[in-house]
Each structure stands twice: as C-alpha cells, then as structure tokens.
Design a protein with these regions (language model features):
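An aromatic- and glycine-enriched ligand-binding surface/loop that stacks and positions planar moieties
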Residues: 20-84, 188-189, 206, 210, ...
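Conserved, well-structured interaction surfaces
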Residues: 39-40, 44-62, 80-156, 168-181, ...
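Short coil/turn linking the two alpha-helices of tandem helical-hairpin repeats
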Residues: 151-155, 160, 198, 219-231
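C-terminal substrate/ligand-recognition segments
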Residues: 357-464
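Bacterial Sec-dependent N-terminal signal peptides
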Residues: 3-6, 13-41, 183, 217, ...
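Short linear capping/connector segments at secondary-structure termini
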Residues: 28-32, 92-96, 161-169
Length: 575
C-alpha cells in the first residue's frame, strides 16, 4: 500500500502535466497526453492516481459521503462543538452555508476524470504481463468510476454525467436514471473484465471482480428500491435484472474466497495486541485483531488503506480522518476514556439504537462490540468536551474510534496504539490513526444475497457468527434488523432506510431523544430547524443535499438547485 501511495503522487503530477509547443514535435522532456501512458509502469501510475482520490477526500472527511451516510441516518446525531455547524447541519438536513459539499464535489469529479483517462488509454499501453493484467486494471478503473458516481448520485441525485476526457463546456445535469444506468454499466464492465481472482496480499487495497459483484448488488438494490424499479436499462440498450444480480452475488458469496472472521470483535481495532489485555471488555478473550502488524482482513473486500507517512502537507489524507472525527471529544485524560482515543466527537450514537437493539436481540454480542455505553464502560468520562459539545449522548461508536494503548515502560498511554505498533518517530493523534476504513465487508454480501433471494441462508450465517439462533422464515423486518445490527456505523444505514422507504418513520424517532448540550442534560428538539427531520426529508425529495451554489454560478445557470434548498435552510447553530 505504501508503494501505491508513492505512485499516486507521481500520477497526480503526470496526469496534469502541461503541454508546450516545440519545433520538434517529439516531446523529449516531459510526459503529457501525447505520450502518456504508454508502458505498464505508466498504467500502474494512472490506476494509483484514481485510488489516490480516496485519500484526497479523506483529508476533508467532514464533507464526504461516508460522513453524511453516518450523520444523516437515524442511528447517529451530528455532534461536535458549537462551531462544528457542518456536522449538525448534515444530521438535520440543513446547510451551514451555500457550498457545504463543494469540496467533495470537486474532489470526486477529479477522481472520475482520472478514471475516464484510464478507461480511454490503458488498452493502448504495452508491456502487460498478460491480457488478464490489462483487463484487471481497466476493470478497476470502471469500478472506481462507478463507486465515485454512486456516492455523488446518492448525495446530490441531479449531477452532470461526464464519461469522456474530451468533454468541453458545461455538461448539463443528467436524469437520475441515466446516471444510475452508467453506474450499473461500469460495474458490469468491471465484473466482465477482471479475472476471477481474489486480490492478493501484495495488492491489498485494490478491488477485484468480487468487490465489483458486491458493489453491483449495493447499487442495484438502492436504485431499484429508492426509485421503485424492477430492473435497469443500460446505455447500450441491454437490461440488468434482479436475476442477473442474484447470479453475481451468488458467485461472490460462493467463489470469492472471502470469509467471515470467526469472532466479530476481531474486526475492530480495540482487539489489537497492544490494547486488548488492558481493556476489560477484551481481556482474556483470546482475541486477535485482523489487521495486527499490517495483516490483511479476510472479510474486507474494499477498504481505504492508510500509512504512517501522513503529514500536514498534501499527505494528510494518508491517515484515517474518519476515526479522528468520530473520536472522544475534549482532550480528556486517556486513562479516563481508555481504550478510546481523542477526536472531534462527531456522530454521537442515538440512545434509540441501544434501546431498539436491546429489545430485539438482548443476547446479541454485537451490541457491546459495536457501541460503548459510557456510564457502564467509562465511569470517569467527563461530559461536555471542551464545554462546547452538541448532541452528546451516553453512547459512542467503538468500530471507528481511535484506539489508544498503554505504554510498556512507566505510566501513560500512547494517543493511538499505531504510534507504538508502527514505531512513530513523531507522535500526533491527528495523524496516527491508520487502521483501515472498510467500505465493503463480506457479511454485507451475505445479507444482500438473502435480501435479493428472499431467503434466510445469508442472514443465518451472519447470526451464527454472533452466537444467535437461526431464523426460520425470511421477512423484510428480519433482514432490515440484521443489517442494522451487523453493519452499524459502516456507512450503509442511510441509503438502506431511504431505499426501503422507512426513512421518515426511522428519523422521527430521533426527536426528543436524551442528549447533552455543553455537558447539561437536554433533549434533541429539532422542529426549529426547517420543521425537523421528517419535514426536511420530505422537502428534499428523499434526503438529497444541495448542489453547491458556486457550481451553479460557474455553470451560468445550467445547473438547477435541488428541491428543498431554495431558501430558509441555513443552519446557524444549535441554540
């Protein structure tokens, strides 16, 4: 993965190299579109440049689709401090300004343009070791273009669809059906191009055919569910049906080589070898974190990989900014919050999740494995953060949190266990969270398989891992609960409740939940902010966010603003 990072920096420079005119038309001094890419090494740099877009967005995670998917869902609030209006606005489907998502828009379209370049040029490169190698790389470009468009379409709905580097001028916003048709088409191309081989340890961080099959199911389920369709017509006139997607997800589940990790707790960083025996919850449990000492998670099918080379320069995105945002707010003594490390307090967990989970599955070990019950686990925790915490609750997310560890000599704690495990020379908690952010996990594949086939096989495999009894008959409610518990805080809940058309009911439960404001008991009352959760969801036609006003202005009015964002949507603060 370190190699991928270095290549990415080269790729960025090369992709945007300027082209000058010489009397001799042969360019001997620089690479540009007339002579790049040509070789296998060039092709590898181009692909690295597309993946690098994941890190670029990670540098500003508060604007990302992943953060939106967490904070806008019914299982979290916005949180953060009184000046972190962006976080609270996402939760409320409001806006702190006119360009709240512009950086994400710009960054993802840069990634799409790199993917367009790869799709157009990699077939002409020489030096591939095999046809499979060439097809694998082109397939990865199709996957990443689809993934980036999936995020943009889910977030904004009405977006320009640019699939060629030759596009000039302003491309109008596409009909959503056209955008989703292209997403599904790209994933189909990725499935057909990439060989039936699981990503090797040496290529960890790259996607494979099976990740494309999983992403196909995710995209198909959202499009057909949210828009109430049964199939989708592709740009070439062919159709992808539910049966087609079942065939792909069956192949993924049966032949991919990915598997469920036997103990659910081993998926999360608090089970690392430096922390587990000092944490009461994990002590003596014979746990082994799947990523200990750079090991590869056998359940992870697509993840953002990080490295210890993050810095305050252009490489800040090499550290896990999402973990930092979800960390414990307030610079509290690490001994009082152990093993959970410092951060900005985004996404406090709604008390309703703990209550619903306890009522539905009182014996489910995943609840305590996923959610920190602060009064029970952290009795020395201090409410209020820097006396500015908004929407604080008694619950934190364990899965994505920074994790600290005790120092072996003397008193004290490492801010993150990675500082010790990977021998950091300079320590900074803002740059040293480097555990993966998993975007597609094999458990999700099994649950999507059950949903598509309306059977209990995948559900029961997931339940068995957690020590729960099997269910005898498939039902939508059983499937929906299983996804909520198994995949909590993994960026899928928001699109799930939207595509199932239960968002209004789910979001309404957030009203009047117990929270704290600046350390004092409060209620989550939101009706003064656009009428509240349900009103805003309805006004925005199902939870779509605003097109950045600067992009509308730059388009000369070609782009039109999304419904529900015309006026009166400015969030100025909690109180």
């Amino acid at each position: 993965m370190k190699k991928l990072k270095y290549l990415a920096l080269s790729a960025i420079a090369l992709l945007f190299a300027s082209c000058e005119s010489f009397l001799d038309t042969e360019n001997y001094t620089e690479k540009n579109t007339s002579n790049y890419p040509q070789t296998l090494a060039d092709a590898q740099q181009v692909i690295a440049g597309i993946y690098n877009n994941l890190s670029v967005v990670n540098a500003n995670p508060q604007y990302s689709f992943h953060i939106v998917s967490e904070l806008a869902s019914d299982d979290r609030f916005g949180g953060g401090g009184i000046n972190d209006r962006q976080l609270q606005a996402i939760d409320l489907l409001m806006a702190p300004g006119t360009d709240m998502m512009r950086q994400f828009w710009i960054d993802r379209y840069a990634g799409i343009q790199r993917a367009n370049n790869a799709i157009e040029t990699l077939g002409n490169c020489t030096g591939y070791e095999s046809e499979n190698q060439k097809n694998q790389m082109i397939g990865e470009a199709h996957f990443l273009r689809a993934f980036y468009y999936y995020e943009l379409a889910s977030l904004f709905e009405n977006i320009p669809l640019i699939i060629s580097t030759a596009t000039s001028g302003t491309t109008p916003q596409a009909d959503p059906a056209e955008t989703w048709s292209q997403i599904i088409s790209d994933l189909k191309s990725a499935i057909e191009l990439m060989p039936a081989q699981k990503t090797t340890t040496a290529n960890a961080g790259h996607v494979d055919k099976y990740a494309a099959e999983a992403m196909m199911a995710r995209a198909f389920l959202f499009y057909t569910g949210f828009y109430k369709k049964t199939d989708i017509t592709l740009p070439d006139g062919s159709t992808v049906s539910k049966n087609d997607v079942i065939g792909w997800i069956d192949d993924c589940a049966n032949n991919s080589g990915y598997s469920l990790v036997p103990d659910y707790r081993n998926l999360w960083a608090y089970s690392n070898r430096l922390t587990k025996e000092d944490y009461t919850y994990t002590k003596g449990q014979n746990l082994k974190w799947v990523e200990d000492d750079n090991a590869v998670n056998p359940e992870s099918m697509f993840a953002i990989k990080y490295s210890k080379f993050a810095s305050w320069s252009t490489t800040i995105g090499y550290s896990n900014g999402y973990a930092l945002f979800f960390g414990v707010r307030g610079s509290q003594d690490l001994g009082n919050t152990f093993p959970f490390g410092q951060g900005w307090g985004a996404g406090p967990v709604s008390p309703a999740l703990w209550k619903d989970w306890t009522a539905a599955e009182p014996q489910d070990m995943r609840r305590q494995a996923s959610v920190c019950n602060i009064p029970s686990e952290l009795p020395k925790y201090t409410k209020g953060g820097w006396t500015d915490f908004v929407q604080e609750t008694d619950f934190y997310d364990k899965k994505n949190s920074p994790i600290s560890s005790k120092k072996t000599s003397g008193d004290g704690y490492w801010e993150t266990f990675e500082q010790d495990m990977y021998s950091y020379s300079t320590v900074n908690f803002q740059l040293s969270n480097i555990h993966d952010l998993v975007l597609i996990r094999f458990a999700d594949v099994l649950l999507m398989q059950s949903e598509l086939k309306q059977d209990v096989s995948g559900i029961n495999k997931v339940r068995e891992r957690s020590g729960l009894d099997p269910i005898g008959t498939y039902s939508d409610d059983a499937l929906r609960n299983e996804r909520r518990w198994e995949l909590s805080f993994e960026g899928v809940r928001w699109n799930d409740i939207r595509r199932w058309h239960i968002a209004e009911t789910a979001l309404a439960v957030q009203n009047n939940q117990a929270v704290y404001f600046q350390g004092q008991a409060d209620k989550n009352v939101t009706t003064n902010n656009g009428g509240g959760y349900v009103a805003r969801y309805t006004a925005t036609n199902g939870g779509f966010f605003p097109i950045p006003e600067s992009e509308i202005s730059l388009s000369g009015g070609v782009y039109k603003q999304n419904a529900g964002w015309e006026s009166g949507t400015l969030y100025s603060g909690w109180k």
